[in-house]
A protein has these predicted regions:
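Helical substrate-recognition/capping region of FAD-dependent monooxygenase/halogenase enzymes
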Residues: 1-9, 13, 28-29, 97, ...
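Core beta-strand elements of the Rossmann-like FAD/NAD(P) dinucleotide-binding domain
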Residues: 6-8, 149-158
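N-terminal Rossmann-fold NAD(P) dinucleotide-binding loop
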Residues: 19-20
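Glycine-rich FAD pyrophosphate-binding loop
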Residues: 27-47
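Active-site-adjacent segment of FAD-dependent monooxygenases/related oxidoreductases
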Residues: 44-119
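Conserved FAD-binding catalytic core of PHBH/FMO-like flavoproteins
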Residues: 70, 116, 158, 162-266
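A conserved short coil-to-beta-strand element within the FAD-binding core of flavoproteins
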Residues: 127-141
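FAD/FMN-dependent oxidoreductases across multiple families
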Residues: 235-299, 319, 341, 395
């Protein structure tokens, strides 16, 4: 329950895309929030680009997708080449979604849009403010922050670290960041190019010189990412970028007007747990991996989408310990799969073994044409295949639920949605009404087109589903499921 003894419900550390999105969602739900950022302003670099279909769906449910679509370059194809010869071209059009494409939006634009949305909700970023310490005591967290040499103490019901790979929150919690560094140097560059390549096609290229990826940002602007043997200067020059393209990419690409470039090394690391008491970590603070696949920012945004409704219920006195602990239990397997997938992709595209290269160049053209491979590839990359099977607060596979009624910010609170089909008999509906009497403000009922019953979580994932033979006993099963994650005094509303 919200305490008058705390200064804020949620203190968020870090105002990158993940922290900004969490702040927006806290504000949308009416939670008191404070968002601190060590930098003096938002990023001016493009950094992360790809926003995948599941993240677009989440933005839609949060009511903020429109400005992102207006700024995006839409990508619907993935081309795979080896030694400058095309091996495969996969049509990236996942079914069962409103957004069957990848939206390319530079990170500086993403941050600016999220800041604008936060201002509309009455929130703000506290720049030049760093976290010094955080200690949990007496049912809240006492933090010390520093701004321009002055330290102050604050209290929060919860603290969430979205403060990147060098996370202060993670260090304060003494959470090991387990993994390793890739033994290669990477370069990236944003350049203007001629229009040889389609603006809606992402390129994954391999060669004897190493891997290279080309992300289309607009008709003639491209992000180039590649391994490089050694750094030449403080940052890659236009000549270096052109050399990379000439060696590894499809022929005929000419780069000019270098906008931004950088060298960097990458790691694959993750923490063993995402929560310690009332403190949580998300995004790069909790996991980092290869940039091939463009999964980093999307995974972080989905972290906080999983977390925020649980914090909301906890602040309102409805969510219990098991609900909060489910954040780590649900997200860690997803993070592990992302790390494994991006690691495999990096190895496949970057292997220097002649035998492995020959095998790759032979196998990819064959398997990439198989519908089963394309479906799995698209489901993994898009985020639409994420599920929470094995979660302590889910019975079943925990797949995402797609329905137009969950769009455009219509679900502005943290209630479950119980969908009952017309085939449900009177006794089942009576059992649902009795459940309603016990769980007001926690579960919302609607009559659904599909038969049976489906319990959909506030984040759009299915907590429980039963087909067209639903019975009153299924309502009691759902009651037990809800009771395990909420406090008994929780109540529920009805739309019968």
């Amino acid at each position: 329950m919200r305490s008058a003894e705390t200064d804020t419900d949620v203190l968020i550390v870090g105002a990158g895309p993940v922290g900004l999105f969490l702040a927006n969602e806290c504000a949308r739900r009416g939670l008191r929030l404070q968002l601190i950022e060590a930098r003096s302003s938002q990023s001016e670099h493009s950094k992360a680009l790809a926003i995948f279909p599941r993240t677009l769906e989440i933005f839609d449910m949060a009511g903020i997708v429109t400005p992102f679509l207006e700024k995006a370059n839409r990508v619907s194809w993935v081309a795979v080449t080896a030694h400058q010869r095309r091996l495969s071209r996969i049509h990236f059009t996942p079914g069962g979604t409103t957004y069957p494409f990848v939206a390319m939006v530079p990170q500086d634009v993403t941050e600016r849009l999220l800041v604008d949305e936060l201002h509309k909700k009455g929130g703000a970023v506290e720049y030049d403010t760093t976290l010094v310490s955080a200690v949990e005591r007496g049912g809240h967290v006492t933090v010390t922050v520093e701004r321009k040499g002055t330290r102050t103490e604050r209290t929060a019901a919860f603290v969430v670290g979205c403060d990147g790979a060098h996370s202060t929150v993670r260090h304060l919690l003494n959470l090991p960041f387990e993994g390793a560094q890739y033994n290669v140097l990477f370069m990236l560059a944003d350049v203007e190019t001629n229009e040889v390549l389609p603006a809606d096609e992402l390129q994954l290229c391999s060669s004897q010189f190493g891997p290279l990826a080309i992300f289309p940002m607009s008709a003639n602007r491209r992000r180039v990412v590649a391994t490089i043997e050694r750094a030449e200067g403080d940052a890659p020059s236009l000549a270096v970028v052109q050399k990379m393209l000439a060696q590894r990419a499809p022929s005929g690409i000419e780069a000019f007007s270098l906008r931004w470039s950088s060298y960097f090394r990458i790691h694959h690391r993750q923490v063993g747990r995402l929560r310690v008491g009332r403190m949580f970590i998300a995004g790069d603070a909790a996991h980092i991996h290869s940039p091939f696949g463009g999964q980093g920012m999307n995974t972080g945004l989905q972290d906080v989408w999983n977390l925020v409704w649980k914090l909301d219920l906890a602040v309102r006195g409805l969510g219990n310990e098991q609900l909060l602990e489910s954040y780590s239990a649900e997200r860690r397997p997803v993070i592990q799969r992302v790390i494994e997938t991006t690691h495999r992709l990096t190895w496949v595209m970057g292997t220097t073994s002649k035998l492995a290269q020959a095998l790759r160049d032979t196998v990819i053209p064959v398997v990439s044409g198989l519908p089963a491979f394309q479906h799995r590839f698209i489901q993994n990359l898009s985020g639409l295949g994420i599920g929470y099977r094995g979660s302590p607060i889910i019975q079943g596979e925990g797949k995402r639920y797609f329905d137009e009624s969950l769009r455009e910010g219509k679900r502005i609170n943290s209630r479950y949605l119980l969908l009952l089909g017309d085939d449900c008999d009177a006794s089942t509906k009576d059992a649902a009404k009795r459940l309603c009497e016990s769980w007001n403000d926690l579960v919302e009922f609607r009559v659904a087109r599909q038969p049976g019953m489906t319990l959909v979580r506030p984040d759009g994932y299915i907590a429980y589903v039963r087909g067209n033979r639903s019975a009153p006993g299924d309502i009691e099963t759902m009651r037990a499921l809800l009771r395990r994650q909420t406090n008994k005094e929780a109540r529920c509303s009805s739309r019968f």
